[in-house]
Amino acid sequence: MAQVETPPQTQQRTPGRPADPCIMVIFGAAGDLTRRKLIPALYNLAKAQLLSREFAIVGVSHNKMSDDEFRKKLGDDIHHYAGNDVDPDIWEWFTRRLYYVTAEFDDKNLYSQLKTKLEKLDKDHSTHQNYFFYLATAPRFFGQIVEELSAAGLMDEAGGQHWRRVIIEKPFGHDLESAKALNQQLLSCVSEHQIYRIDHYLGKETVQNILAFRFANGIFEPIWNRRYIDHVQITVAETVGVESRGSYYDTAGALRDMVPNHIMQLISLTSMEPPISFRPDAVRDEQAKILHAVQPLSSEEVLTRTVRGQYGSGVEGGQRVPGYRQEEDVPPDSRTETFVAMKLAIDNWRWADVPFYLRTGKRLAAQTTEIVIQFRRAPFVLFRDTPVENLMPNQLVLHIQPQEGISLQFAAKVPGPIMRLGAVDMNFNYADYFGTQPSTGYERLLHDCMIGDATLFQRADMVEAGWCVVSPVLDVWKALPPRNFPNYPGGSWGPKEADELMERDGRHWRNFDR
């Protein structure tokens, strides 16, 4: 057995439990996700001393490479994607734990070959036969890979003597029926507790902070209901277009790509009831309850409560940008939406008559993900002689990206001899207060998988509940193809119909300049 080395210690340990000894197997290891997100996140965990000393990584892809070529390829990228100075000693320790297997995912021989390799590496690195498999592949391979892993005995936990887990990237199905079918396929060969359906948004500090903000502060939870909240807005806006993902995106669209996963998770954390504890299933039970309480839209409501759009050419950051139909690998007559806005309702006591407005899109005016809690207006009877009709209601904004933080807008007297009100902000920024930039989210999620904490991962029932909300919209949109695409210029806030969706209710989106 090889001597176990400890990662070089160059800084104080980050608080938290070190990961269990294990081997991580990345299917799709030659892809962008591995070099841009996974390897930098694992390096950051090593630097923070949150990786076990007994650790190794095996990359699997059809690209032909040796171990050394794989290490060099990742070494060339790490300085660009790690986001900070790379410590050469830590990186050297890390690269000695990188291995590579060249194979096609549908080659049955791969899995017996992989089992032999893992058994050897387990002895070399003392990883206690703990393995987890990250499926950074096309969705069509998800079920087949897990079936083959199970058939090879690689998902067998030997009665709890060791653990075996699998992380699955989105998209998890392309509609409700395919999501159910994939869940059934997976659960026919592994247990639910072994499946970690990942959504990297849930690894972000502000998303995790939603529960702490709500339930650890006595001043907010008592007013977190229909008596005090007028409505909720959720915006996930991107300034970029589809870039090199045209062929994938054109088969998915903004609705499938963002709503049943990212946005439904944000809705659940914002609106769920207090869990009995922070144990994984206690939290996820409450999330599942609220997702099942989101009312699916009728066919008539789809026509009045949803908006779809597609970006045309425009100006982004002072530069002319092409329209969606001019992007690489996109058909010139594509009817795929790049923008979605919806008005949803939650059918329970806490949120009765409180609309949830959501929007997401590409080539919008600003890069931002945020949750806006807009409170009901105060009675301005005391200020009847003061111009208050243009004063914004109180807003609590949870900024998720790019700058993570929380802000509260409220009214205050403007200095001067007369009573005049103005809107002011109280701002909390993670980077300013804690002196560090929050991580990408993958660090937290990978670490959670290695310690067996599934709180921030979706269960089968949560995935299916998200698709239940989206499916009626997909059906109506398929029956009634759009006739006015493209209908918003790149660099704008989307089609005018999205503004009208809220204006009909006497409300407005929270828009701002970049």
Which sequence ranges carry the predicted segments?
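Secretory/organelle targeting and membrane-embedding segments
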Residues: 1-168, 172-514
